Amino acid sequence: AGDEVITSAYTYTASASPAVHVGATLKFIDVAPDSFEMDYEALEAAITEKTKVIVPVDIAGVPCDYDRIFDIVERKKALFHPSNDVQRAIGRVIVAADSAHAFGASYMRDGERIMCGNVADFTSFSFHAVKNLTTAEGGALTWRPIEGFDDEYIYKQFMLLSLHGQTKDALHKNGLGNWEYDIVAPSYKCNMTDIQAAIGLVQLDRYEGLLKRRRDIIERYDEAFKTLGHLTVPHFTDRHTSSGHLYLLRIPGIGVDRRNELIVQ
């Protein structure tokens, strides 16, 4: 329908490919100078009457500047033309965060600490094998309440998309007398298994300690690099607390060829 989705150019394909799956047009925004986040001025300039979703990327586990992003979509509200009931209820460009790196991160808003997952309109997390918390594969999705929509309705839409368009999830289907179900759409198959969930629950029990250990390591790195003039990600500030997923370092005068040589060495 000509809809547009905007995301960061500095990310993994998962931030962008869902837009392609639904036939939308992608717009990539490069990072700002001396930053790992989107150039927010370029983001604002890229919004048109066709823009439906912005996908900020919480790179390395550091939350984006969501206050600035929401200010932008509010200023551009007059351009927004909703094409479904959820878009009409939200009434502006939707902010759907790629927080694959940021499970356990938090963001300060009006003096209140808000956990990542309750900042953007929708937030996706990854539990891939290399993430802080893993279920071997898979992830999770959260959303803020949408006026006029019951959470159970939103959940069911995701259930239909992730389980072949089946009208009952595995838990309800296995209840006494509940075996019968319908297929209402040719959807995907990406639901989490019980075994994966069990692994995740064990990880959750120890996750607070894992986050603390990552913070300890990052603070040691920060201390070591602070006088060298390298660009690093600000993991812990008055605005946010990172999950510490990656420690990114940009060294002046060192390009990708030298980086690759060091990795091989």
Where are these regions (language model features)?
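Structured loop/turn residues at beta-strand edges in well-structured enzyme cores
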Residues: 49, 91, 117-118, 190, ...
